[in-house]
A protein has these predicted regions:
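Short linear regulatory motifs enriched in tryptophan with gly/pro/ser
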Residues: 1-175
Length: 175
């Protein structure tokens, strides 16, 4: 059996950036992280975490937040009961119903937020992770998050229009 997910990069529009992936049902969150990295073309150069922080009900004072990440990157700000080891926690234990969602943040500096939605199970014995559908090019690493990416797209659109625009493009390339 395999788990099927739609992973959508949030706060990036025109075009939307999303991937549909399938992974074996025994995958841990660390393995899901690797599958997402490959599907989006990220280079796995930064820290990551899964959590409910971006999606939990902030109007409900009893809503708990949690973090699933590598143990060596556990923050002192996070209480022990809120932290889970991504190499030990199986995705299938957390996302059990069609439509269940979790937030995946890659690069805690640029803060690329992805919504991971569980689409259901597939009855197949294909091995490994697979990207089966998608849309939109993934932003480049270290471009400054959503705001930096918006600036980069503007620079690219204007690069040939004036000397100042060409200089701005060159400055970005040199950075």
């Amino acid at each position: 059996m395999r788990l099927k997910f739609k992973v959508t990069l949030k706060r990036v529009e025109r075009p939307k950036v999303w991937r549909e992936i399938t992974v074996p049902e025994d995958y841990t969150f660390d393995q899901l992280h690797t599958a997402i990295q490959l599907a989006f073309g990220w280079t796995n150069s930064h820290l990551y975490q899964f959590s409910d922080v971006e999606i939990y009900d902030k109007t409900n004072p009893y809503s708990e937040s949690f973090y699933i990440t590598l143990p060596e990157f556990q923050s002192d700000d996070i209480e022990e009961e809120e932290f889970y080891d991504s190499t030990q926690e199986h995705v299938s234990s957390w996302l059990t119903k069609k439509g269940d969602k979790i937030s995946y943040v890659y690069d805690l500096g640029d803060h690329w937020v992805h919504e991971v939605e569980f689409l259901g199970m597939e009855d197949t014995n294909v091995r490994g992770a697979h990207c089966v559908a998608g849309e939109g090019a993934c932003p480049p690493e270290d471009c400054g998050g959503t705001y930096g990416f918006a600036d980069l797209k503007k620079i690219c659109r204007n690069a040939g229009k004036s000397k100042a625009a060409k200089a701005e493009w060159q400055e970005y390339l040199d950075w």
